[in-house]
Amino acid sequence: MSTSRNVPNKKNNTKQQKYQQQSQKQFKTVRATGNGEKEPFSLAMSYGHIPVVTASVHLLSSFLLRHLSFISSKEEKVFGSLTVFAAEAADKVSEHRQCLQRLINETMDSNMTSYSADVFNIQENQVKRDNGPTHYSVWYRSGNFAPNSILESNPVTLVDADAFDLIKQLTYRLGKAIFRLHNNGNSSFDIYVKDNLSNFKIYLNNLADHLEKDDIYDNFLDMVESQAKIKKDYYLNNRNLLVDNKSSNRTHHKSGDKSTVKSTDKQVEKKVEESSEKVPEVPKKIVIPKSACKPVVGGVSFAQAAGKSQTANSDTKEDQVTTSTSESTVEVKSLEVKETKEPDEEVFEDLNN
């Protein structure tokens, strides 16, 4: 039984390793040199509008790395030793931030009962994710509350801040945490956290002192300020042009729509009037008079015109006419009646064919 208690639980170890991997991904460090990764320039587009006094510790350190990496990317011919110093400073700031992130992860893993958890303000993560961190540091990740009076006197945003603004706010946050740990931290872990935070604060103060004495950094800030002013003026001018073009296009489209509506209404009215005035023409039926269907005595009948012989009928007619005039008239009438039936059928048959 005693041996089973001493055997480590493999499931718990694997879960702890996965959690550490996820926490390292969440607190992924950013470096300014070629050995690591540079801070993305999209950071300014996303968080540059936030005031420095309300920004989180994570954003303050991120924008400080961004500022130093920007200086280190310049040519040495222009800024001389400042570019080399900025690259070294970016490495040091990145190392101290890695240490700070590691302290927060250790606090969440195994030191939740220490006073450091209260200083870092460790809270449970409300958004549950698969294999994700269950806790996070409000002190490191969330913003800082500042009243309106302080915001009015300190309106500098992250994108416009220089190294002095960022270092001043970082040392202020670190100093408050160190003061609380010094007064209330009793465990060895609290002392360990306090010492690391003190080292980070000391280095930031030394960095600010060096930049303040460097005249090249002042020239760099003047150059950045002039470039920012040029970009701002260019942006405002283009924005005004776009607004003017949009307003003119809107008025043009509105007037054009009204004219087209009026023209279409007039066209519809004309079509209605034309359709009401016009009367559909009904085709007339062709009527053949009955008199045209009767044969002519002594002339050419319709049957003869169609190419049919009437020899038998003509012989009988001649014999009947020579006997007597009275009988011929009667017989001719009878023959007319007989002949009117036959030619009618033949003529209509020919017409149908």
Swiss-Prot record:
What's the protein name?
Uncharacterized protein R616
Record's compositionally biased regions (Basic and acidic residues): 254-280
What segment(s) does the record annotate as region Disordered? 1-24, 245-280, 305-353
Using the record for this protein, list the coiled-coil segments as residue ranges, or answer none. Answer: none
Organism, as annotated: Acanthamoeba polyphaga mimivirus
Q: Residue ranges under compositional bias (Low complexity)?
A: 9-24, 321-332
Composition bias (Acidic residues) maps to 342-353
